């Protein structure tokens, strides 16, 4: 073979290997970085004009000079610092790089001194707007993005296309500016993104809080990303479905300039002194640093401190130009907020990272999981950060043994891939525009867009956490009798059940089994296992196993009929579902309570004798991005001799959004104190384990509240009627959590019975009976995968609109009754008498919209209510809408007619539905029941509480119902969105038959094909908390 032929063959093999990068599976636990490295190393002897990477020399120069345009997001320094590493290698290879950024020049020029680096100070996105170092303002972030990138979009695209042509750019790189990808496509230049997250995923959460009218922002961002050729994905990544192809690389980390010894010598710090670096991204921290914050003998190096900030003697202010990677590597641990830069450097230099959560940033759970997997992370509660209670966290951090051994040359490898692509590799074959390529995607509860046919790449740890909570879509709806019996026997072996009965409930037996395993976890802290879920470790030390434990259970609910009409006084029909929340409670004398180390430090700092402390562990934190534990001194609930107000409690729990969930649990204690005069003298340990998935519209919050209050009441000998307990739990959600829900959720969870519908008139909470579900009728819930929240903007605005409508109706009725108004309008007393003065008087004092009949509404008020009204206009005319749990935003326009009309008609539909359930069995009966569900669904949509996912599910049910091949044996008859709407679960009614279940599974698969999400199916029922009672148990000590 000739020399030329040999070279050509080697070239072809190398090209095939490089091309295979695009086909590699999602990178897990960094193992794949070795595969990438071997491919790259195999190219080191390729043709001279091609690039190669040498272990010592980095990216070698190509004979083809290239011009790169590198766009950097405006969010923080972390993106800019990792871009430096990639740019440094590109410039070393002889290319020009134009960096488009809003970051200060020194971030780049301190590392790269080359005329080939060009910096253009332009900001084309805004990232997340932060109120301070730890708090993201979600609405402000969306508004700022609109102002920065949406309003001037046409001008931006025109300017960027012109600029790209002017610099003769060969290739565009984005980290991770959306519009840059579209600008590159318009300029006819190929582009690639380099990132660990994308802004469509981050903003999808903000849309939920700000309202779905902002949804177009997410769609546009995804469409922009879809124009790039592929994604170079960094470790700790989020799902990013808008990208066509993915190449995974190792960590991109800034190189070290000096050794630990050199840095400490320059700073005058001895080798044996423990050092923590305080690193919050250069943002002002806003708290007072105290000498007592550190353990004795420690020093703290402060990054980004203002010139005027006075520091205690054991704190050292670092120079503005201090090179942070060297300082981190020379420290014993780091204290800061999680971001890609801090996490990657902590892992690379094996420096334990004490982190404080940021609010509302979806990137964080993925980075946090990676940090904790490699034994490199300790979470600090925000309260302890601000109060200076750092010692237990720092001491815990230096006991860790970080074990990350993966690659840290991601910048080098990314530069290699970019150069290879720019000189002609991986040419794009798909010339369709991004908008035509993308399809709907539902990912981790958010509505996004995806490239069809590509794996969405949900991280394995997330799926595992879902399965552990019993929330897997593939989980079996029933437990076989023999399996159930073995579970019962097993839990009886583990515990003496001193009071109560498990009632054959398999989930209760499973919970008791998990309780029995906790003391094993506690005793095996020296376990050789690489990673134990943090919440399990915390739960392992929660209970004293020699003392009694009280267990309560409360199910979620399926909203069959009624929904949001509950706060307007409607009749509702609710079914308790199979999935439930379990809560275990134990009382302890304060002196004998096992306290977590930071709780001990807090009490010692106060210099007080042991006082009652509440400690809570909640399972499922990994999939809901919240802290797994919460603790407080119960004295914090007291103001002198009286309990604090609900308003103060709401502010107390809102201080740290990562721990706001505790309001649902701990709030039950304060309600008992305020409403029943209970005082708590003992410490309380409480474990929450809920299989009712959050954000699905099946009342996960009510199940937690009811189970928590039931268990606490049982442990303290309080006997509370189930109805009264439900009303108390509603106060938790309304007044302490601050969510404007009605009472039907808590009432169903507390008073419901298995396989029956709870019928209740919400005025405010009159249970009118239990309705037997006929044997031939069955209800299912199908989860749309879209997170739902009654605290969201859409639910709240619809409630405000309904109360506005009620106030207007009352005002109109009063006006008609007024003699002066009647004569002014040309009316006469006889006409008034014909209409019915009693009727008008009742409407003038209308307590609930549902007490107004549909025909009366249409005859007198429908054409007089406005479709929309500005909040300020309403307040000027009517003063207030008389709703104790919502506030009118004067600058916002509210829909009025649809939200007011909905409960009036819904109440009529529910009454009809209830009557139909007791009518003769027939297809007409089922058809009528289904028709009422459809009516309800479209009424929700008219109010603005629909969603693409729930609409799609209802359409799939309709298609199944009207499919000719199914018409002879019709099984599904109707479907509707449930609860607060805007996502969540769809309720389906059908014939109780095997064919119906098969059709439900078929809908599940069709939905997955359309959205990439396999929905949960809720079927079956279980008893409410009142019917279950409680268990009083004691651990059996094995001999």
Swiss-Prot record:
What InterPro entries does the annotation carry?
Galk_glycosyltransferase (IPR012369), GalKase_N (IPR019539), GHMP_kinase_C_sf (IPR036554), GHMP_kinase_L-arabinokinase (IPR053205), GHMP_kinase_N_dom (IPR006204), Ribosomal_Su5_D2-typ_SF (IPR020568), Ribsml_uS5_D2-typ_fold_subgr (IPR014721)
Spell out the reaction equation it catalyses: L-arabinose + ATP = beta-L-arabinose 1-phosphate + ADP + H(+)
What EC class does the entry list?
transferase
Q: What GO molecular functions are on record for this protein? A: ATP binding; L-arabinokinase activity
User: Which key words tag this protein in UniProt?
Assistant: ATP-binding, Carbohydrate metabolism, Kinase, Membrane, Nucleotide-binding, Transferase, Transmembrane, Transmembrane helix
GO terms classed as biological process: arabinose metabolic process
EC number of the protein = 2.7.1.46
Ranges annotated as spanning the membrane: 662-678
Q: Which residues form the active site?
A: 745
Which positions in this protein are listed as binding ATP?
693-703
Q: Please report the record's description of how this protein sits within the membrane.
A: Single-pass membrane protein
What GO cellular component is one of the record's annotations? plasmodesma
| Compartment(s) | Membrane
Per the record, the domain of life is: Eukaryota
The residues annotated as site (Transition state stabilizer) are 557
Task: State the function annotated in the UniProt record.
Answer: Arabinose kinase. Involved in the salvage pathway which converts free L-arabinose to UDP-L-arabinose. May play a role in arabinose transport.
Note the PANTHER family from the entry. Answer: GALACTOKINASE, SLR1395 PROTEIN
Give the similarity note.
Belongs to the GHMP kinase family.
Task: Cite any additional comment in the entry.
Answer: Sup1, a suppressor of the ara1-1 arabinose-sensitive phenotype, contains a second point mutation resulting in a premature stop codon and a complete loss of kinase activity. Therefore, the putative arabinose transport function is independent from the kinase activity.
**Name by which UniProt lists this protein:** L-arabinokinase
* Record organism: Arabidopsis thaliana
């Amino acid at each position: 073979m000739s020399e030329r032929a040999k070279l050509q063959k080697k070239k072809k093999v190398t090209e095939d290997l490089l091309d295979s990068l695009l086909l590699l599976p999602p990178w897990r636990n960094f193992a794949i970085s070795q595969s990438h490295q071997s491919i790259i190393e195999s190219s080191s002897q390729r043709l001279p004009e091609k690039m190669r990477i040498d272990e010592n020399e980095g990216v070698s120069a190509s004979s083809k000079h290239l011009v790169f345009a590198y766009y950097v997001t405006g969010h923080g320094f972390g993106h800019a610092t990792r871009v430096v590493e990639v740019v440094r290698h590109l410039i070393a290879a002889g290319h020009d790089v134009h960096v488009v950024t809003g970051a200060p020049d020194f971030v780049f020029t301190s590392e790269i001194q080359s005329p080939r680096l060009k910096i253009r100070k332009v900001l084309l996105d805004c990232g997340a707007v932060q109120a301070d170092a730890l708090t993201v303002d979600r609405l402000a972030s969306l508004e700022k993005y609109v102002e920065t990138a949406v309003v001037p979009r046409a001008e931006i695209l025109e300017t960027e296309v012109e600029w790209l042509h002017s610099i003769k750019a060969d290739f565009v790189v984005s980290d991770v500016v959306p519009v840059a990808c579209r600008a590159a496509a318009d300029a006819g230049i190929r582009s690639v993104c380099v990132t660990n997250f994308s802004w469509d995923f981050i903003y999808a959460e903000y849309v939920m809080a700000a309202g779905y009218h902002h949804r177009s922002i997410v769609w546009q961002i995804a469409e922009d990303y879809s124009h790039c050729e592929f994604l170079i994905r960094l470790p700790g990544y989020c799902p990013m479905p808008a990208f066509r192809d993915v190449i995974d690389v190792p960590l991109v980390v800034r190189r070290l300039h000096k050794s630990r010894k050199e840095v400490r010598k320059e700073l005058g710090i001895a080798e044996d002194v423990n050092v923590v670096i305080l690193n919050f991204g250069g943002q002002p921290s806003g708290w007072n640093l105290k000498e007592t914050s550190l353990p004795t003998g420690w020093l703290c190096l402060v990054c980004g401190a203002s010139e005027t900030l006075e520091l205690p003697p054991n704190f050292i202010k670092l120079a503005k130009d201090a090179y942070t990677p060297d300082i981190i590597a020379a420290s014993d641990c780091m204290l800061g907020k999680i971001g890609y830069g801090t996490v990657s450097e902590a892992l690379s230099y094996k420096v334990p990272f004490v982190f404080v959560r940021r609010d509302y940033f979806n990137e964080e759970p993925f980075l946090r999981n990676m940090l904790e997997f490699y034994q490199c992370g300790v979470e600090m509660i925000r309260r302890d950060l601000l109060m200076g209670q750092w010692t237990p966290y720092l001491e815990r951090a230096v006991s860790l043994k970080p074990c990350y051994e993966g690659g840290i040359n991601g910048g080098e490898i990314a530069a290699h891939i970019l150069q290879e692509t720019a000189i002609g590799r991986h040419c794009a074959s798909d010339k369709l525009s991004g908008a035509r390529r993308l399809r709907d995607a539902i990912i981790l509860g958010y509505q996004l867009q995806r490239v069809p046919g590509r794996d969405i790449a949900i991280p394995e740890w997330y799926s595992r956490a879902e399965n552990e909570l019993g929330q897997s879509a593939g989980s079996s709806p029933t437990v076989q009798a023999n399996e159930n019996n073995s579970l019962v026997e097993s839990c009886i072996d583990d515990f003496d059940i001193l009071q109560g009965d498990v009632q054959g409930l398999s989930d209760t037996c499973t919970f008791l089994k998990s309780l029995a395993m906790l003391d094993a976890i506690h005793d095996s802290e020296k376990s050789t296992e690489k990673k134990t879920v943090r919440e399990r470790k915390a739960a392992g030390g929660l209970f004293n196993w020699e003392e009694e434990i009280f267990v309560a259970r409360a199910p979620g609910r399926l909203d069959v009929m009624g929904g949001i009409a509950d706060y307007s006084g409607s009749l509702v029909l609710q079914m308790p579902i199979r999935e439930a929340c379990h809560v275990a409670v134990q009382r302890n004398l304060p002196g004998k309570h096992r306290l977590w180390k930071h709780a001990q430090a807090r009490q010692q700092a106060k210099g007080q004798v042991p006082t009652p402390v509440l400690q809570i562990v909640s399972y499922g934190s990994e999939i809901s991005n919240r802290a797994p534990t919460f603790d407080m001194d119960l004295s914090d609930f007291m103001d002198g001799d009286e309990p604090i107000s609900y308003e103060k409690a709401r502010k107390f729990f809102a201080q740290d959004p990562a721990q706001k969930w505790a309001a649902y649990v701990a709030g039950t204690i304060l309600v008992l104190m305020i409403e029943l005069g209970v005082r708590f003298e003992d410490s309380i340990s409480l474990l929450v384990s809920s299989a009712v998935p959050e954000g699905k519209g099946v009342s996960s919050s009510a199940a937690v509240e009811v189970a928590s209050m039931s268990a606490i009441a049982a442990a303290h000998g309080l006997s509370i009627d189930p109805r009264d307990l439900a009303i108390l739990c509603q106060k938790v959600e309304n007044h302490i959590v601050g969510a404007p829900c009605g009472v039907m959720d808590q009432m169903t969870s507390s008073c419901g019975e298995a396989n029956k519908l709870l019928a209740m008139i919400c005025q405010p909470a009159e249970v009118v009976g239990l309705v037997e579900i006929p044997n031939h009728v069955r209800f299912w819930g199908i989860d749309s995968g879209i997170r739902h929240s009654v605290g969201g903007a859409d639910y709240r605005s619809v409630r405000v609109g309904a109360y506005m409508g009620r106030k207007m109706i009352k005002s109109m009725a009063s006006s008609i009754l007024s003699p002066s108004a009647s004569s002014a309008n040309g009316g006469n007393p006889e006409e008034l008498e014909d209409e019915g003065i009693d009727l008008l008087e009742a409407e003038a004092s209308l307590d609930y919209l549902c007490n107004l009949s549909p025909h009366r509404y249409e005859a007198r008020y429908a054409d007089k209510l406005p479709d929309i009204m500005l909040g300020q206009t309403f307040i000027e005319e009517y003063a207030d809408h008389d709703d104790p749990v919502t506030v009118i935003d004067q600058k916002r326009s509210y829909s009025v007619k649809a939200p007011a009309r909905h409960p009036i008609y819904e109440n009529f539909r529910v009454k009809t539905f209830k009557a139909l359930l007791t009518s003769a069995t027939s297809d007409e009966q089922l058809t009528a029941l289904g028709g009422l569900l459809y009516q309800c669904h479209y009424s929700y949509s008219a109010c603005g509480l629909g969603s693409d996912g729930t609409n799609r599910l209802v359409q799939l049910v309709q298609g199944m119902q009207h499919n000719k091949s199914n018409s002879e044996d019709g099984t599904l008859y109707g479907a509707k969105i449930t609860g607060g709407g805007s996502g969540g679960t769809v309720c389906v009614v059908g014939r109780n038959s095997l064919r119906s279940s098969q059709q439900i599974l078929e809908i599940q698969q069709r939905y997955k094909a359309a959205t990439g999400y396999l929905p949960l199916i809720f079927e079956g029922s279980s008893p409410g908390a009142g019917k279950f009672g409680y268990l009083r148990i004691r651990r059996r000590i094995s001999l």
